[in-house]
Amino acid sequence: MLASSTAFLTFALSLLNVAEAASVNKHAELNSAAGCHDYVIIDSRATTEAQGPSVASKGMIQKTLSALPGGTSAQTVYPASFQFQVSAGVGAAWVHNYLKQGIASCPKQKYALVGYGQGAAVTWKALANVGTDDPLHEAIKAIVLLGDPYHLPHLPGNIDDHEGNSTDGAQGFGVKEVGFPGSEKITPWAKDGKVLNICALGDQVCQYSKSSSEDFGPHKVYKSSAQVQDAGAKFLTQKLGGKAGKGAE
């Protein structure tokens, strides 16, 4: 009886994953069809957050949209479940399709990618096959990550939640896990000055060690930190604030 129940659960989960993957193109088409803007901020939420804006990045995105006219935001459509690799893969496919359709429809439109927790992994996975010669590399002006499980040590853009360097040498828990895109996929974006990677001191998601406790309190500080929200908004505004034209022109 237990075996049959387990088999049924596995089958049900596989159907859910297929359905989520099938919805990627549909949602990307709906969002990219909304018209061209000077820029779009794509927001990928963390594990178990409800579909919609992430609580950790909502403030900085609102500040950016208010300070820099002509933009809009989109929220990545994906499960954000504890099935990390499957869930993040669905999100990455959605983001990549959104970007490809967007640059085809609105070639002058700029992009910023913002990711929190699993949403940061979604972001890196979505960019894994975007080379420096890809038009998307030029179109993507900014990447802001909070509590990144793929955080790499000593890269440009690494700061802590007080804009210091206490976590500059940190490595995320996902770096040695199956599914890590590889440092060679991440480093060029950072060296181009396009990345602000904020890792709070003690956040074991982005500052992992074998002795890490199970206290996830530091992973939750981003949403309530005015300094984090201001730093993110400042970075986004600076990177997106160059001369832009409507994508349809």
Task: List each language-model region with its residue ranges.
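Fungal secretory targeting signals
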Residues: 1-25, 249
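Short, surface-exposed "cap/lid" segments of acyl-processing enzymes
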Residues: 23-71, 75-77
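Short coil/turn segments at beta-strand junctions that form active-site/ligand-binding loops
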Residues: 37-38, 107-111
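Surface cap/lid and interfacial helix-loop subdomains adjacent to catalytic sites
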Residues: 43, 57-65, 75, 97-101, ...
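Second-shell loop/turn segments in exported
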Residues: 46-51, 80-89, 110, 219-222
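Extracytoplasmic/secreted cell-surface and envelope-processing proteins
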Residues: 50-53, 83-85, 121-125, 152-156, ...
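Alpha/beta-hydrolase active-site loop
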Residues: 85-103
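Gly/Ala-rich beta-loop-alpha elbow adjacent to hydrolase catalytic centers
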Residues: 113-123
